[in-house]
Structure formats: structure tokens, C-alpha cells
Regions:
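Membrane-embedded alpha-helical segments and adjacent helix-loop junctions characteristic
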Residues: 48-135, 281-351
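Interfacial loop-to-helix junctions that mark the boundaries of transmembrane helices
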Residues: 1-3, 23-26, 48-58, 168-180, ...
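Membrane-interface alpha-helices at helix entry/exit sites of multi-pass transporters
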Residues: 93-98, 129-140, 170-178, 350-360, ...
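Small-residue-rich segments of transmembrane alpha-helices in multi-pass membrane proteins
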Residues: 33-43, 62-65, 90-100, 141-152, ...
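Long, contiguous bundles of hydrophobic transmembrane helices that form the permeation core
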Residues: 185-271
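Juxtamembrane and boundary regions of transmembrane helices in multi-pass small-molecule transporters
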Residues: 171-220, 368-371, 375-421
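Alpha-helical transmembrane segments and, especially, the helix-loop junctions at the ends
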Residues: 107-117, 134-170, 176, 188-194, ...
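Hydrophobic mid-bilayer segments of alpha-helices in multi-pass membrane transport proteins
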Residues: 3-13, 23-43, 56-67, 229-239, ...
Length: 421
């Protein structure tokens, strides 16, 4: 049975790595779903075992955040933030700074994939209206969204996995990884400035902030549902506050997300069916399938054999190992499948420092290449649909520099935190 499980696992992850196999229309979710079904079909797992393998805490957190974010998206909240904040800048360099930090901070609390999905058209519209090359700003958006998302449990899907399985509180997660993200965003600003020096010399037409806001909204066809936002935004803020108070209130983070989602559907002014249609059900299927596939190799003892030979300890070597393996494997299978496989290993290590290092490293590694993270691909696809092309090597030259520098910062900061705390 070990051989069967290993073959299924290998085929599944090959499908995840090579999303377009010859003569097969396959993507990552379908490859994972095939693996999950195969584990049951070939007797590695029973149907009940497969169901119990799914981490419904993670699924619940994802679902709750998706419903909240979908409502804010329909309300036009993302465009409102992007347009208002970016209109403040009166030079291209200030625009770069505002864009980088707005994207990074928004990604920490609103899930980075959703942020870039809705910020990208606004950034392209702003660049065109101000006669600027949008590519440097789009690259800064990608890099900052990934770096910013590392600082909270709700910043990206892999952090949700880590937050649920590690038991680290929302506040502690933010406290420990905030320095990594803030310094990382500063690195992004100066790296983009270095690679695109023309940003420093360009100037905007002389207009006040209100004039720029009006122009940008007209260019982007912005539409805001302020009536709905009066309900959805306070509920979202309440959810974030409750995340920080989850320990004293004895409420789990997934439950808080579901409470917020139910309130926003019940009290919001957007038709619930419209919101639910925008939920990324494919991503939920992807997660559920990965849980089943990994549990299959756990059940037959393959994971235990690996654990017998690989030990992670709360040492310099352990921190370095997590950063190195994250950098390599996140490029191969992407950060979510990589994190799912790492969960059993991390649980045996039983170290909050190593959990935080994994959250930081697996996220930062996504900036190395244009295919390193889902947020990267979302920006590329939207940009191409609007006639803007970001070349692989153009991104790689700046992406690898930012990744290596931010990974060094991550290693140094997590090491200091390990020593001090």
C-alpha cells in the first residue's frame, strides 16, 4: 500500500508542478482532486478517513474571509482605498511608496490575492492617466502584496494553514512578523527605485489631491456602494478586532470569520447569492484535496519514515533549513502545496519560532519568479488583458534581489526573536 500511496502522491504533485501536461487539460486543483479520489479508489483511505483528513478549521477560515472580501469587492471598497490613497502622491516616487505600503498593509488583512485582483486595474488606469510606465508599479504591487501578507494569519492561504495548526495567536503572529514585512516593503521601494531610476525624475501635472482623485475615478470608472459599505466595512473592522481578542474571548479565529461572514450576509445590502457566487470554491476544493492526499501518505507510514530522518530543531540550522527549503520548493510546487506537506514535520518540531519562520519564508519565496505565487499570476493576467506585458526576466531581475534580501531579513529577525524570547 505504501507504493500505491507514493505513486498517487507523486503523480498528484507532478500535476501540480506542470499545470499543462501534454494532451491533458489539467490545473492544480484538478490534479489535487484526482489525487484525493485516487487515494480512496485504490484503498489507501476509506471515504470516512478522507473526510476526517480535511482540516475544516482552515476551510472555515478561508470561506468566512472569502465571503467578507467578496462583499467588500462588490461594494467597491478596494477601488475606493486604492484611488484615495494613490491620489495623495504628487510625484511618481511618492506614488511608488504609497502604492507599496497600501498594497502591503491591505494584503495583511484582506488576503493578498483579492487585493491585487482589484488594485491592478486601478494601478494601470492611474499609470496611463499620468502617462507613466505601469510595469514598475505593478512589480512593486506584486512584491509588496506578498511581503505584506506574511505578517498576519489572514494575509494568505498558507498563513491560514500555519495559524490554525500552530495555535499562535493573531496578535503574536503580527507582532513577530511585522518587522519582516515593514522592512521588506522598504526594500521593495528602493529596489524598484534602483532598477527604474526614471521614477525619480518624472513629475505629475500640478493638481491638488481632489482633482487627481476625480481624474483617477473618471479614468477607472469607479463605482462605490456607500450604502452597503456602511454595514460591510464596520463588520470587517469588527472581525479584525475580534481576531486580536480571540484568546481572551475564547473564540477560535475560524469561528470569528464565520460570524463576520454570516453578519455581512444577513445585514449587508448586497444580495447573498451574488456574494456566494464570487467565493473561490475551486480554492476550497484544492485545499480539501491536498489534505486528503497528504493524509494518505501519512496513514501508510511514509511521512513517519521522513520524520525519522529529518528533524527540525529551534536552532540556527533549523531556521536556515526552513528558509532554504522554502526558497527552493515554493518555486517548484508553489507555497500552498509545499506548506501542506510541511505540516506534519512542523507539528513534531513543536516550535512557534519555526512556525513563524515557515510563514515568513514560504510567503517571501513567492517573489523570486513571476510564477512563484498566485498573486503574481493574477497581476500578470490582468495586465496582459489591458495591453501591459511584464517579461519573465524583467521581473526575475528585481524579484530575486528582493527575495534574497527579504529572506535574509526574515532569517535575522526570527533568529533575534528566538534568542530574545
Amino acid at each position: 500500500m505504501q507504493t500505491t500511496a507514493l505513486i498517487i502522491f507523486t503523480i498528484t504533485y507532478i500535476g501540480i508542478i506542470f499545470t499543462r501536461l501534454p494532451r491533458m487539460n489539467i490545473d492544480r486543483p484538478s490534479a489535487a482532486f484526482f489525487g484525493a479520489v485516487a487515494m480512496i479508489l485504490f484503498g489507501v483511505l476509506t471515504f470516512d478517513e478522507a473526510i476526517h483528513a480535511i482540516d475544516f478549521n482552515t476551510i472555515a477560515l478561508l470561506l468566512g474571509m472569502m465571503i467578507i472580501i467578496s462583499t467588500l469587492e462588490i461594494d467597491g471598497f478596494f477601488e475606493w482605498i486604492a484611488t484615495r490613497t494613490m491620489a495623495i502622491a504628487d510625484t511618481p516616487f511618492k506614488l511608488l511608496v504609497v502604492l507599496s505600503f497600501t498594497t502591503g498593509i491591505a494584503s495583511a488583512f484582506l488576503v493578498n490575492d483579492a487585493v491585487v485582483l482589484l488594485f491592478t486595474p486601478v494601478i494601470i488606469g492611474i499609470s496611463f492617466s499620468l502617462k507613466l510606465n505601469p510595469v514598475p508599479f505593478l512589480i512593486a504591487e506584486i512584491l509588496s502584496s506578498n511581503i505584506g501578507s506574511a505578517m498576519t494569519i489572514t494575509g494568505n492561504p498558507q498563513n491560514m494553514l500555519i495559524g490554525i495548526n500552530s495555535g499562535i495567536s493573531y496578535g503574536k503572529f503580527l507582532l513577530f512578523l511585522l518587522p519582516v514585512s515593514v522592512l521588506g516593503m522598504i526594500v521593495v521601494v528602493y529596489a524598484v527605485k534602483w532598477f527604474y531610476p526614471s521614477i525619480i525624475t518624472a513629475h505629475f501635472p500640478e493638481k491638488d489631491t481632489k482633482s487627481r482623485t476625480d481624474i483617477l475615478e473618471a479614468k477607472n470608472g469607479s463605482h462605490y456602494n456607500y450604502h452597503s459599505m456602511r454595514f460591510s466595512v464596520p463588520i470587517f473592522i469588527l472581525v479584525i478586532i475580534l481576531f486580536f481578542l480571540s484568546r481572551p474571548l475564547n473564540l477560535s479565529i475560524p469561528l470569528i470569520a464565520l460570524i463576520g461572514a454570516s453578519l455581512i450576509l444577513l445585514l449587508g445590502r448586497i444580495k447573498p447569492s451574488k456574494v456566494i457566487k464570487q467565493v473561490d470554491w475551486v480554492l476550497l476544493l484544492f485545499f480539501a484535496s491536498l489534505f486528503i492526499v497528504v493524509h494518505g501518505i501519512e496513514k501508510v507510514g511514509l511521512m513517519q519514515q521522513l520524520l525519522n530522518h529529518v528533524k527540525l530543531t529551534e536552532t540556527v540550522a533549523g531556521l536556515a533549513g526552513i528558509h532554504a527549503i522554502s526558497l527552493v520548493l515554493s518555486q517548484v510546487v508553489s507555497n500552498v502545496p509545499f506548506t501542506v506537506v510541511m505540516l506534519p514535520l512542523m507539528k513534531t518540531a513543536n516550535s512557534e519560532t519555526l512556525w513563524l519562520a515557515l510563514a515568513s519564508a514560504s510567503t517571501l519565496a513567492g517573489n523570486a519568479t513571476i510564477i512563484g505565487a498566485m498573486a503574481n499570476l493574477i497581476v500578470i493576467e490582468i495586465a496582459e488583458s489591458k495591453g501591459v506585458k511584464i517579461k519573465f526576466m524583467e521581473f526575475f531581475h528585481i524579484g530575486i534581489v528582493v527575495t534574497l534580501l527579504s529572506m535574509l531579513l526574515s532569517f535575522g529577525i526570527t533568529y533575534l526573536e528566538m534568542v530574545i524570547w
